[in-house]
Amino acid sequence: MSRYTGPSWKQSRRYGISLTGSGKEIARRNYVPGQHGPNNRSKLSEYGLQLAEKQKLRFTYGLSERQFRNLYVAATKVKEGTVGYNFMTLLEQRLDNVVYRLGLATTRRQARQFVNHGHILVDGKRVDIPSFRVQPGQVISVREKSMKVPAILEAVEATKGRANFVSFDADKLEGTLVRLPERDEINPEINDALIVEFYNKMM
């Protein structure tokens, strides 16, 4: 399954979670898209609930099913911690996500574009792979030639608060993943146990 590239508001309303980070698409119409959206309140089966939770998280990070599943498999091989927590942590360690968490982009989709276009450095070296796994202590910065890109400057100015597990220097346009996040610091609205149950049945 390829990565979804359509309007993010449709998936936001379908799964009841803001994919843009603004929450406006949910506040405006808090029901699924389509002609019968307001009346579409059918009860989901156990499988349906698990699938919906998986899709909700997958669309939040903007990954294809293959990318998402491969990361889940990697999480099952981590010796310490629960699979659910390890999976969420690996998602958070993606370079595009860290760029978003630092406030260098307004959405994860935009962060992925910045990485792909070579605007981002890791420990002073350009990395254009969105899935690059950032380790605590690594410095994420903007390439000197990209420091005046309007979209980056606008994102930094628009960011009002940042997660406790990152630090950011707005003057230098650089930040650090200080530590791995606690579970309650990342997507607390996601029930990762349902996702684990889903993949346990599929694998």
Swiss-Prot record:
GO CC term, one of those recorded: small ribosomal subunit
One term of GO molecular function: rRNA binding
Keyword set, alphabetical order: Ribonucleoprotein, Ribosomal protein, RNA-binding, rRNA-binding
Keyword Membrane tagged: no
GO biological process, one term: ribosomal small subunit biogenesis
Leader sequence segment: none
Top-level taxon of origin: Bacteria
Positions of the S4 RNA-binding domain: 93-156
InterPro entries on file: Ribosomal_uS4 (IPR022801), Ribosomal_uS4_bac-type (IPR005709), Ribosomal_uS4_CS (IPR018079), Ribosomal_uS4_N (IPR001912), S4_RNA-bd (IPR002942), S4_RNA-bd_sf (IPR036986)
Annotated SMART domains: Ribosomal_S4, S4
HAMAP family to which the protein is assigned, alphabetical: Ribosomal_uS4_B (MF_01306_B)
Annotated family: Belongs to the universal ribosomal protein uS4 family.
Subunit annotation: Part of the 30S ribosomal subunit. Contacts protein S5. The interaction surface between S4 and S5 is involved in control of translational fidelity.
Job of this protein: One of the primary rRNA binding proteins, it binds directly to 16S rRNA where it nucleates assembly of the body of the 30S subunit. With S5 and S12 plays an important role in translational accuracy.
PANTHER family: 30S 40S RIBOSOMAL PROTEIN, SMALL RIBOSOMAL SUBUNIT PROTEIN US4M
NCBIfam families, per the entry: PRK05327.1, rpsD_bact
Protein name: Small ribosomal subunit protein uS4
Source species of the chain: Lactococcus lactis subsp. cremoris (strain MG1363)
